[in-house]
Every structure is written in C-alpha cells, then in structure tokens.
Amino acid sequence: GYDSKAFAIALEKIAERYSDRVNSGSKIFIYLESPCNPHGYVLDVPGICKRAHELGHRVIVDPTVGTPFLQPLLKIADRMERPDFVLHSYTKDLAGTGTTTAGVVIGRNEDMFVPKNSSVEATWPDGSYRTVNWDQSMFWNVYYIKGGFLDADKAFEVLNGMKTYEMRVLQKAINTVVLAKVLSTHPCINVSCPVLEENPNHTLLEKHMYLGLPA
C-alpha cells in the first residue's frame, strides 16, 4: 500500500515481530523512498510521518527520484508531517551529469551537529523537549567516524549542474506525461504510470507532487 493506513498495519507487524529488541532499548526508524524507483509510485509521506511521530519513531525519506522541485518535503508546514531526515543523491537529477558520485543528508541543526563534549536542548515534532548529546549528532556518529566529505571539485560539479536542474526535471516530467498518455491509447500496450487517472496511485500523485507531475 501507499497510504498511512497500510503503513500503520505494517508497522504494527514489525513492532510485534521485533518486540524483544524494542523492549530492550532498540529504536525503530522509518525509511521511505518516494517517489519509488523505478515505478514512480508516490507514498503519503505526510500521513506516514504523522503516524510515525505519534508513536515516537523517526522518519527518513529518500525523494531522489522526485528531487526537491517535484516533492519539497521540507516545506511541509506541520512538523508532525515532515520527515526528520531527507536524503538525496547528487549523482542523478540534481547534478545531472552523472560524473559525481555523492549524496546529501538534510536534517535539523541539532541532529546534524552538536559541538564536541556538549549538549543542546531541542524539541520533538510534537513539541516536547529533548536533550541531544554531541555523540548523538550525525557529524560525530556517522560522518566523522564512517564517512567522508565531498571534495571541492565534486562540490563544484554539483553546484554547476544544479543551475539547470529545475529545467531538466520539468522537461523530464512533461515528457513522462506525454509518453504515458500517448502509449496508453494503444490497445496493445498496458501502461502503469501514476499520471494516468485510472492508476490507483494517481490521487496521491495529484496531492503530494508539485503540479501533480510524475517523477
């Protein structure tokens, strides 16, 4: 399924299956990809985020296929409906050249970096307070220990490619609409694309994607 109801059912099953780990202190993180690659299915990200946050879980979303142009998740007004972290691959549409192997993680300041040996007061999506220690932030817990930073040349390639990314993404979306609708008129071709009104995912596409455009 694509909506929050299907998610709630799946989450309940997972929580039950791994109840021993959850009870011993392990955390549940929700990882979503929307639009999904390669079919372009759109998930009800705001609805899923709200349900997950109500249960105290954190949400990570990869909208690489849609890009921030078609699916600007961080502009969602209600923080309960907004993911905690957003991931993007620079390698694909953002840079557009395919010459840069890189990605980005976007989150709130206190989740990304806290000065060493210190802590900060922050809030959960529901407004309740929490304390974030320095070793819980992304910089110290992941980047510093396990990953590297993008070098200057690759960063330049990404920034240079992003000058045209909105134009490229828009043209690709228009091409998808035209191609899907033309092919769907052929009696011997079965087209599965959310942009078609008869597709079961069409309503979510219209609701959550910019101008109802497909990725």
Where are these regions (language model features)?
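Conserved PLP-enzyme active-site core in the AAT-like
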Residues: 1-186, 192
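Conserved PLP-binding catalytic core of the aspartate aminotransferase-like
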Residues: 191-215
